Protein backbone atom coordinates (compact mmCIF):
# COMPACT_ATOMS: atom_id res chain seq x y z
CA UNK A 1 0.00 0.00 0.00
CA UNK A 2 1.16 3.50 -0.81
CA UNK A 3 0.37 6.81 0.88
CA UNK A 4 0.01 10.15 -0.86
CA UNK A 5 -0.62 13.52 0.76
CA UNK A 6 -2.13 16.50 -1.06
CA UNK A 7 -2.28 19.95 0.50
CA UNK A 8 -3.79 23.11 -0.90
CA UNK A 9 -1.80 26.24 -0.15
CA UNK A 10 -2.84 28.34 2.83
CA UNK A 11 -4.97 31.45 2.44
CA UNK A 12 -3.37 33.89 -0.01
CA UNK A 13 -3.74 37.65 -0.14
CA UNK A 14 -6.10 37.40 -3.11
CA UNK A 15 -8.09 34.63 -1.38
CA UNK A 16 -8.60 37.14 1.41
CA UNK A 17 -9.61 39.85 -1.06
CA UNK A 18 -11.92 37.36 -2.87
CA UNK A 19 -10.21 37.93 -6.22
CA UNK A 20 -9.66 35.50 -9.08
CA UNK A 21 -6.00 34.55 -8.69
CA UNK A 22 -5.10 31.78 -11.12
CA UNK A 23 -1.49 32.07 -12.26
CA UNK A 24 -0.95 35.51 -10.69
CA UNK A 25 1.76 35.20 -8.05
CA UNK A 26 0.64 36.29 -4.59
CA UNK A 27 1.96 35.30 -1.18
CA UNK A 28 0.22 33.86 1.86
CA UNK A 29 -1.51 35.98 4.47
CA UNK A 30 -0.58 35.57 8.14
CA UNK A 31 -3.61 33.29 8.41
CA UNK A 32 -2.37 31.28 5.43
CA UNK A 33 1.06 30.86 6.98
CA UNK A 34 -0.49 29.57 10.17
CA UNK A 35 -2.73 27.20 8.19
CA UNK A 36 0.37 25.79 6.49
CA UNK A 37 2.23 25.43 9.77
CA UNK A 38 -0.77 23.73 11.33
CA UNK A 39 -0.91 21.31 8.41
CA UNK A 40 2.74 20.46 9.02
CA UNK A 41 2.12 19.96 12.73
CA UNK A 42 -0.78 17.60 12.03
CA UNK A 43 1.33 15.55 9.65
CA UNK A 44 4.17 15.35 12.16
CA UNK A 45 1.83 14.34 14.99
CA UNK A 46 0.34 11.65 12.73
CA UNK A 47 3.81 10.23 12.14
CA UNK A 48 4.22 11.13 8.47
CA UNK A 49 7.63 11.28 6.81
CA UNK A 50 8.29 11.99 3.15
CA UNK A 51 11.00 11.21 0.60
CA UNK A 52 10.02 13.68 -2.11
CA UNK A 53 7.82 16.75 -2.48
CA UNK A 54 6.20 18.42 -5.46
CA UNK A 55 4.75 21.90 -5.84
CA UNK A 56 3.72 24.39 -8.48
CA UNK A 57 6.01 27.30 -9.36
CA UNK A 58 3.73 29.81 -7.60
CA UNK A 59 4.88 31.40 -4.34
CA UNK A 60 1.80 30.52 -2.31
CA UNK A 61 2.28 26.78 -2.91
CA UNK A 62 6.06 26.94 -2.48
CA UNK A 63 5.69 28.88 0.79
CA UNK A 64 3.08 26.44 2.06
CA UNK A 65 5.30 23.46 1.34
CA UNK A 66 8.29 25.13 3.01
CA UNK A 67 6.28 25.86 6.16
CA UNK A 68 4.86 22.32 6.25
CA UNK A 69 8.32 20.78 5.93
CA UNK A 70 9.76 23.20 8.49
CA UNK A 71 7.17 22.10 11.05
CA UNK A 72 7.95 18.47 10.23
CA UNK A 73 11.71 18.93 10.51
CA UNK A 74 12.13 17.90 6.86
CA UNK A 75 13.38 21.12 5.26
CA UNK A 76 16.09 19.09 3.54
CA UNK A 77 13.57 17.15 1.48
CA UNK A 78 14.10 17.18 -2.32
CA UNK A 79 11.45 19.34 -3.99
CA UNK A 80 10.42 19.36 -7.65
CA UNK A 81 8.44 22.37 -8.88
CA UNK A 82 6.54 22.44 -12.14
CA UNK A 83 4.14 24.80 -13.87
CA UNK A 84 1.82 21.92 -14.70
CA UNK A 85 0.81 21.91 -11.01
CA UNK A 86 -0.18 25.60 -11.15
CA UNK A 87 -3.69 26.77 -10.37
CA UNK A 88 -6.24 26.93 -13.16
CA UNK A 89 -5.67 30.02 -15.32
CA UNK A 90 -8.64 32.36 -14.95
CA UNK A 91 -7.94 34.28 -18.15
CA UNK A 92 -9.43 37.77 -18.36
CA UNK A 93 -11.02 37.31 -14.91
CA UNK A 94 -7.59 37.33 -13.22
CA UNK A 95 -7.46 40.01 -10.55
CA UNK A 96 -11.20 40.74 -10.55
CA UNK A 97 -13.24 40.69 -7.35
CA UNK A 98 -15.43 37.56 -7.42
CA UNK A 99 -18.45 39.14 -5.74
CA UNK A 100 -18.31 42.26 -7.93
CA UNK A 101 -18.00 40.07 -11.02
CA UNK A 102 -21.05 38.10 -9.87
CA UNK A 103 -22.99 41.31 -9.28
CA UNK A 104 -22.12 42.48 -12.80
CA UNK A 105 -22.58 39.25 -14.75
CA UNK A 106 -24.88 37.32 -12.41
CA UNK A 107 -24.21 34.52 -9.94
CA UNK A 108 -25.06 31.87 -12.52
CA UNK A 109 -22.56 33.12 -15.12
CA UNK A 110 -19.77 33.35 -12.54
CA UNK A 111 -20.68 29.89 -11.25
CA UNK A 112 -20.34 28.58 -14.82
CA UNK A 113 -16.93 30.25 -15.19
CA UNK A 114 -15.75 29.03 -11.79
CA UNK A 115 -17.37 25.63 -11.47
CA UNK A 116 -18.48 24.25 -14.82
CA UNK A 117 -16.36 21.39 -16.08
CA UNK A 118 -15.55 22.49 -19.61
CA UNK A 119 -16.42 26.19 -20.01
CA UNK A 120 -13.36 28.45 -19.67
CA UNK A 121 -13.60 32.15 -18.81
CA UNK A 122 -12.70 34.72 -21.50
CA UNK A 123 -9.07 34.58 -22.67
CA UNK A 124 -6.48 36.93 -21.23
CA UNK A 125 -5.04 39.25 -23.86
CA UNK A 126 -1.43 38.53 -24.85
CA UNK A 127 -0.56 42.14 -23.97
CA UNK A 128 -1.79 41.68 -20.38
CA UNK A 129 0.62 41.29 -17.48
CA UNK A 130 -1.35 38.13 -16.66
CA UNK A 131 -0.35 36.35 -19.89
CA UNK A 132 2.18 33.75 -18.67
CA UNK A 133 4.71 34.32 -21.47
CA UNK A 134 5.65 37.65 -19.83
CA UNK A 135 6.71 35.89 -16.61
CA UNK A 136 10.38 34.80 -16.41
CA UNK A 137 9.50 31.55 -14.65
CA UNK A 138 7.98 30.31 -17.93
CA UNK A 139 10.94 31.36 -20.06
CA UNK A 140 11.78 28.69 -22.61
CA UNK A 141 8.23 27.31 -22.76
CA UNK A 142 6.44 27.69 -26.09
CA UNK A 143 3.88 30.44 -25.54
CA UNK A 144 1.36 28.41 -27.51
CA UNK A 145 1.53 25.76 -24.79
CA UNK A 146 0.86 28.28 -22.02
CA UNK A 147 -2.83 28.87 -21.27
CA UNK A 148 -4.76 32.07 -21.89
CA UNK A 149 -7.71 30.70 -19.89
CA UNK A 150 -8.67 27.27 -18.59
CA UNK A 151 -11.74 25.30 -17.64
CA UNK A 152 -11.35 22.51 -15.11
CA UNK A 153 -11.19 20.08 -18.05
CA UNK A 154 -8.26 21.97 -19.55
CA UNK A 155 -6.58 22.09 -16.14
CA UNK A 156 -6.91 18.32 -15.88
CA UNK A 157 -5.43 17.96 -19.37
CA UNK A 158 -2.43 20.00 -18.17
CA UNK A 159 -1.93 18.32 -14.78
CA UNK A 160 -2.35 14.63 -15.64
CA UNK A 161 0.67 14.27 -17.96
CA UNK A 162 2.89 15.38 -15.07
CA UNK A 163 1.17 12.88 -12.79
CA UNK A 164 1.64 10.02 -15.24
CA UNK A 165 5.17 10.90 -16.35
CA UNK A 166 6.74 12.06 -13.08
CA UNK A 167 4.74 11.69 -9.86
CA UNK A 168 3.19 8.25 -10.41
CA UNK A 169 6.52 6.56 -11.20
CA UNK A 170 8.03 8.12 -8.06
CA UNK A 171 5.26 6.69 -5.87
CA UNK A 172 5.46 3.27 -7.51
CA UNK A 173 9.23 3.43 -6.97
CA UNK A 174 8.62 3.60 -3.23
CA UNK A 175 8.86 7.34 -2.64
CA UNK A 176 6.60 8.81 0.04
CA UNK A 177 5.20 11.88 -1.68
CA UNK A 178 3.53 15.15 -0.67
CA UNK A 179 2.11 17.55 -3.27
CA UNK A 180 1.50 21.22 -2.41
CA UNK A 181 -0.63 22.85 -5.06
CA UNK A 182 -3.93 24.66 -5.63
CA UNK A 183 -7.67 24.19 -5.42
CA UNK A 184 -8.18 23.28 -9.06
CA UNK A 185 -4.94 21.46 -9.83
CA UNK A 186 -5.66 19.29 -6.78
CA UNK A 187 -9.28 18.82 -7.87
CA UNK A 188 -7.84 17.54 -11.15
CA UNK A 189 -5.85 14.90 -9.28
CA UNK A 190 -8.73 13.99 -6.96
CA UNK A 191 -11.10 13.56 -9.92
CA UNK A 192 -8.64 11.23 -11.59
CA UNK A 193 -7.70 9.22 -8.49
CA UNK A 194 -11.28 8.81 -7.29
CA UNK A 195 -12.68 8.30 -10.80
CA UNK A 196 -15.25 11.03 -10.16
CA UNK A 197 -17.74 12.01 -12.83
CA UNK A 198 -17.70 15.44 -14.46
CA UNK A 199 -20.76 16.33 -12.38
CA UNK A 200 -19.39 15.04 -9.07
CA UNK A 201 -16.20 17.09 -9.24
CA UNK A 202 -18.18 20.33 -9.53
CA UNK A 203 -19.31 20.03 -5.91
CA UNK A 204 -15.85 19.27 -4.50
CA UNK A 205 -14.28 22.12 -2.54
CA UNK A 206 -10.78 21.68 -1.14
CA UNK A 207 -9.97 23.64 2.06
CA UNK A 208 -6.76 25.63 2.43
CA UNK A 209 -3.87 24.19 4.42
CA UNK A 210 -5.54 20.90 5.36
CA UNK A 211 -3.65 17.67 4.51
CA UNK A 212 -5.66 15.24 2.36
CA UNK A 213 -4.32 11.72 2.86
CA UNK A 214 -4.75 8.89 0.37
CA UNK A 215 -4.14 5.21 0.99
CA UNK A 216 -3.50 3.68 -2.45
CA UNK A 217 -3.33 0.06 -3.59
CA UNK A 218 -0.63 -1.48 -5.79
CA UNK A 219 -2.21 0.13 -8.89
CA UNK A 220 -2.56 3.50 -7.10
CA UNK A 221 -6.31 3.12 -6.78
CA UNK A 222 -7.70 4.72 -3.61
CA UNK A 223 -8.45 2.47 -0.66
CA UNK A 224 -9.17 5.37 1.67
CA UNK A 225 -9.20 9.18 1.52
CA UNK A 226 -9.44 11.47 4.54
CA UNK A 227 -8.57 14.96 5.71
CA UNK A 228 -6.50 15.41 8.86
CA UNK A 229 -8.17 17.68 11.40
CA UNK A 230 -11.53 18.53 12.92
CA UNK A 231 -14.36 17.50 10.53
CA UNK A 232 -16.65 20.41 11.48
CA UNK A 233 -13.90 22.99 10.95
CA UNK A 234 -12.98 21.42 7.62
CA UNK A 235 -16.62 21.47 6.46
CA UNK A 236 -16.88 25.15 7.38
CA UNK A 237 -13.78 25.88 5.28
CA UNK A 238 -15.23 23.94 2.33
CA UNK A 239 -18.49 25.88 2.59
CA UNK A 240 -16.56 29.16 2.59
CA UNK A 241 -14.76 28.15 -0.62
CA UNK A 242 -18.10 27.33 -2.27
CA UNK A 243 -19.50 30.80 -1.46
CA UNK A 244 -16.58 32.81 -2.85
CA UNK A 245 -18.13 33.40 -6.26
CA UNK A 246 -21.47 34.74 -5.04
CA UNK A 247 -22.62 38.34 -5.16
CA UNK A 248 -22.76 40.04 -1.78
Curated annotation (Swiss-Prot):
PROSITE patterns: PG_MUTASE. The lineage of its organism: Bacteria, Pseudomonadati, Pseudomonadota, Gammaproteobacteria, Cellvibrionales. Its EC number is 5.4.2.11. Belongs to the phosphoglycerate mutase family. BPG-dependent PGAM subfamily. Substrate binds at residues 8-15, 21-22, 60, 87-90, 98, 114-115, 183-184. GO terms for molecular function: phosphoglycerate mutase activity. The active site is at 9 (tele-phosphohistidine intermediate), 87 (proton donor/acceptor). CDD domains: HP_PGM_like (cd07067). The keyword Transmembrane does not apply. It comes from the Bacteria. It comes from Teredinibacter turnerae (strain ATCC 39867 / T7901). This is 2,3-bisphosphoglycerate-dependent phosphoglycerate mutase. Pathway: Carbohydrate degradation; glycolysis; pyruvate from D-glyceraldehyde 3-phosphate: step 3/5. Signal peptide: none annotated. GO terms for biological process: gluconeogenesis; glycolytic process. Pfam families: His_Phos_1.
Amino acid sequence: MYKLVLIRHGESQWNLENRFTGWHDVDLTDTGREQARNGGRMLKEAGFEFDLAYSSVLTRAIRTLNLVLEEMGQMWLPVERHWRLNERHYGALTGLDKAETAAKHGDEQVKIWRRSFDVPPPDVDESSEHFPAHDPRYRGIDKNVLPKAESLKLTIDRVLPYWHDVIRPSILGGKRVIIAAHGNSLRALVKYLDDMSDAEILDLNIPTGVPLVYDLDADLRPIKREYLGDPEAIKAMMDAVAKQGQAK
